[in-house]
Curated annotation (Swiss-Prot):
Residues 1-54 are annotated as: Disordered. The lineage of its organism: Bacteria, Pseudomonadati, Pseudomonadota, Gammaproteobacteria, Alteromonadales. InterPro entries: Ribosomal_uL15 (IPR030878), Ribosomal_uL15/eL18 (IPR021131), Ribosomal_uL15/eL18_sf (IPR036227), Ribosomal_uL15_bac-type (IPR005749), Ribosomal_uL15_CS (IPR001196). Belongs to the universal ribosomal protein uL15 family. It comes from Shewanella oneidensis (strain ATCC 700550 / JCM 31522 / CIP 106686 / LMG 19005 / NCIMB 14063 / MR-1). GO terms for cellular component: cytosolic large ribosomal subunit. This is Large ribosomal subunit protein uL15. Gene3D superfamilies: 3.100.10.10. One of its GO terms (biological process) is translation. Pfam families: Ribosomal_L27A. Binds to the 23S rRNA. Keywords: Ribonucleoprotein, Ribosomal protein, RNA-binding, rRNA-binding.
């Protein structure tokens, strides 16, 4: 068996409806588009969010908040992911080398999710209260 020889079972897939191919098909002539109007034309239709000229909901509602640019380069690392890191010292570069976080990440925060068995030293990363307790319970320590 090869990937290029795989195919669905006979009768498992329906043929797509062929529109505009004669009156006997039931979808001839106007091809299910009705008569005239913008939506019947080639390329016809309106963009998503267009409300026919009425002031759109997006503009009627007030603006709020902002998008933090720091959040784009900050990652949350779960405690159980620390096991993927080789060595006892865990810092930003160690997380990148272990492919726990991507290369563009500049800040990381360790959150409590899962458990850790071996003692590790966390350097230069933010740590939540729960994660701190879990790391210290395993015999590890946190250095700022």
């Amino acid at each position: 068996m090869r990937l290029n020889t795989l195919s669905p079972a006979a009768g498992a897939k329906h043929a797509p409806k062929r529109v505009g191919r004669g009156m006997g098909s039931g979808l001839g002539k106007t091809a299910g588009r009705g008569h005239k109007g913008q939506k019947s034309r080639s390329g016809g239709g309106v963009r998503p969010g267009f409300e026919g000229g009425q002031m759109p909901l997006k503009i009627r509602l007030p603006k709020f908040g902002f998008t933090s640019r720091r959040a784009m380069v900050t990652a949350e690392v779960r405690v159980l992911e620390l096991a993927k890191v080789n060595g006892d010292v865990i810092d930003l570069n160690a997380l990148k080398d272990a492919n726990v976080i991507t290369r563009n990440i500049q800040f990381a925060k360790i959150v409590l999710s899962g458990t850790i068995e071996r003692p590790v030293t966390v350097k230069g990363l933010k740590v939540t209260k729960g994660a701190r307790a879990a790391i210290e319970a395993a015999g590890g320590k946190i250095e700022e």
